[in-house]
Amino acid sequence: AWAQGLGLAPERWQAYAADVQVVDSIVDAGQRCLASQGLPEVVIANAGISIGMDTAVREDIDVMAQTFATNNIGLAATFHPFIAPMTQRGSGALVGIASVAGIRGLPGHGAYCASKAAVISYCESLRGELRGSGVKVVTIGPGYIDTPLTRQNRYAMPFLMQPQDFADKAFAAISAGVSYRVIPWQMGVVAKLLRLLPNRVFDKALAGRPRKKRRNG
């Protein structure tokens, strides 16, 4: 429906069903894409979930495992089928969608923040591994995007963006060949300031902040 709404010709797009939490499923989808569409210029690993977590609750450990399976293992599996052929061609871009939440941990967001911090570090590692190959690795760190999921949040979301505005800015960043970009730029400034805060100041600033809703909380 999305592609049809954009008026794309049928030969220019194809949907491939896959379960991002199952490595072989997502790798197979990538291989089917290569077989039917050829090698793309850009691969974007965007799948992600965000569920509140309380480490004292046993079932929330499973939430953390699911979060990492989706946000991290799924991301690497998405890239996997395309790395060798892109390297052989000497061009291409692998884009990992992280989050400003990966810059500092937020109470009640342990699984999500940790997973997005891991995305940032993983993409940085992969960028170094592919240096000189012609394949770029781009890390995009969105702030708050207005979606049905974020509308469930119980706290203020500064600099909230509409999805199309974010997509346009992300496209521009990828096209410009940047290696890392926080969108919108205001959240990038906020994130840098938060990173510089001493722990005692940061902890005090977040005291009493509403937490992300847990799956059964």
Please report, for each region that a protein language model flagged, where it lies by residue:
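Rossmann-fold cofactor-recognition segment
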Residues: L6-D24
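Active-site helix of classical SDR
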Residues: F79, S115
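Residue(s) in the substrate-gating loop at a strand-loop-helix junction
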Residues: S99
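Active-site-adjacent segment of SDR/Rossmann-fold oxidoreductases
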Residues: R104, S125-K136
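Active-site loop-to-helix junction immediately N-terminal to the catalytic Tyr of the SDR YXXXK motif
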Residues: L106-C113, S125, N153
